Amino acid sequence: MSRLYGAQSMVAPLRRVLVRAPDAAFGSVDPARWHYTATPDLPRARAEHAAFVALLERAGADIIRHDAPLTDRADAIFVHDPVLVTDRGAILLRMGKPRRRG
């Protein structure tokens, strides 16, 4: 049986990666509300994300894209932060920023 989940190493080759591209919510965020220093540059963030995904693909990783709209979750592009992935699934941890909770 193949594993659907697993992230027991921070240095092993990546085989499957969940990504979320910066969307309109990220580009129109109120910096003070999300504790950013400035409004994000959405075109630049999208270009950097695309380059990162291309790098992962060239390295042989299977890319899983989370594209569902999340209108009130500007920080949702950071998919690694609040999750501990195990062989049996993901454990959702406590978000650091109050706006990211819920």
Question: What are the functions of these language-model segments?
Answer:
Residues 1-102:
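The feature marks the mature, well-folded catalytic cores of soluble enzymes
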